Amino acid sequence: MTQFDKQYNSIIKDIINNGISDEEFDVRTKWDSDGTPAHTLSVMSKQMRFDNSEVPILTTKKVAWKTAIKELLWIWQLKSNDVTELNKMGVHIWDQWKQEDGTIGHAYGFQLGKKNRSLNGEKVDQVDYLLHQLKNNPSSRRHITMLWNPDDLDAMALTPCVYETQWYVKQGKLHLEVRARSNDMALGNPFNVFQYNVLQRMIAQVTGYELGEYIFNIGDCHVYTRHIDNLKIQMEREQFEAPELWINPEVKDFYNFTVDDFKLINYKHGDKLLFEVAV
């Protein structure tokens, strides 16, 4: 049993047993297959904590880990909102939200690419500012990135689910706290928890720190009603030991990472489970 499997199953059980239904509301989300309202059971404010002795990835089902890393690189490294760039990587998870111009509007990578921080007399974006400050001002309590920009929310195809990171350097270790306003536990959470841990490992490597604690906070923690049956099946499955994530130690520049610089070794998992997408 992995740290992630244990915490994940605990949250799923809590939502199924104690979650509050939103069926009283005319909800925004619709099922992609038939356009009917996609309702949820939800609880508020859940936290997952990992000591980084193992990589947090589910073993009760197969997680498309390379796809998760490609999405991470698209947002954090390319700082892109262009869905066609993601399509070129063979990833189509954002196709349902693609606008006429081929982008997701002013969301995700667009926000990270804005040059809105002052550094040594010039403007830089949030990622470059974070990397510089972690190296040169590690004791700061202001190592934060933010994707929730009220000025741009109306210009986003989808407002960010994971919207904030806060980084701490203590005793030579890089700790990361992530905040998600909303998390679809069947589809979004396994991706997000894994990929932001990968981000922590990447940034620790290029800034010269050891790995510290990893904390993932969720505001609206929910399960879609059509996902419940398969989630119950998933929770009863055999759990395996956590795999090892290898990251190419030769990469010292954040912008030089490619998906080929990552290997998930001995990843044992249950069969893939299909969960319908709500948009």
From Swiss-Prot:
EC number: 2.1.1.45
Coiled-coil positions: none
Keywords in alphabetical order: Methyltransferase, Nucleotide biosynthesis, Transferase
Pathway(s) of this molecule: Pyrimidine metabolism; dTTP biosynthesis
Entry keyword annotation includes Transferase: yes
Reactions it catalyzes: dUMP + (6R)-5,10-methylene-5,6,7,8-tetrahydrofolate = 7,8-dihydrofolate + dTMP
Binding residues for dUMP: R141, R142, R181, S182, N183, D184, N192, H222, V223, Y224
Active site annotation, chain numbering: C161
Residues that hold (6R)-5,10-methylene-5,6,7,8-tetrahydrofolate according to the record: D184, A278
GO molecular function: thymidylate synthase activity
InterPro entries, sorted: Thymidate_synth/dCMP_Mease, Thymidate_synth/dCMP_Mease_dom, Thymidate_synth/dCMP_Mease_sf, Thymidylate_synthase, Thymidylate_synthase_AS
Example GO biological process: dTMP biosynthetic process
NCBIfam families assigned: PRK01827.1-1, thym_sym
Assembly mode: Homodimer.
Record-stated family: Belongs to the thymidylate synthase family.
Purpose of the protein: Provides the sole de novo source of dTMP for DNA biosynthesis.
Protein name (Swiss-Prot/TrEMBL): Thymidylate synthase
